[in-house]
Amino acid sequence: NTLEGFSRLRKLGIPLDESEIKEMQISAVAYLDKMIVNQKKKNPDKNLSYEDICYLYVRSSYRDIPLAGETLDLHKKMVEKLRYWVNLSTIEKAYAATALYRYGFVEDAKDILKSLRQYAVSQPAKGMYWPNNRSHYYYNNSAVQEQCALFNAFSEIEPVTSELDAMRQWLLSQKQTNDWGAVPSTLEAIYALLEGGTDWLAPDENKTSIVWGGQEMKNSPEEPFLGLTEYTLSGNEISAAA
């Protein structure tokens, strides 16, 4: 989560202390590389596990940190296995598509998105989502986290504004009726709302306006887009409706 969070902050253009952060990233990535090699030596399974796919997904954000030796050899074999994605779960397909796209397997990534579109549901009230989009390998994932993984894949590989907006609409519908769950789910949902699709926070000619007693109520300058805006009128300013 930490490495993925740093990569998202960089993508959003958030200023970071690059020297200190980069040192942390290099150490964390080196640890992941070492762990995956050790695991594969102990359990040389022919198939990729959910954790393997997550590793490739996160590692693909740090292609500027080189691989070498047995780590590089293993990595190449794992990426090649990732191209056989048909039996993966929905979230695994999302991670696989993103990783393959970053590693240059563009057509494979687009094929995965084509398959995912076939299973998507679009409704005016809910937007675009995938029913039962829960990993059968990793029960801790919430539907919100999986929706965000799908959103990120579509946003990076084939960004269609109408689809991205519909996927964000589903996220907002979950917030209206429940909540986004634990902290990771909430962070991922906020990132999705900020990262792709129509800029819903941009001021434009179609912004919402409130008119009260013939006077337009202005947004608070301190909170132009988010937060609570209060309007107070004294008794003599209020008259009975005609």
What do these predicted ranges mean?
Residues 1-15:
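A conserved hydrophobic secondary-structure block that centers on an alpha-helix together
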Residues 19-22, 26-36, 40-46, 50-242:
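Long, domain-scale non-catalytic interaction/scaffolding regions in large secretory-pathway
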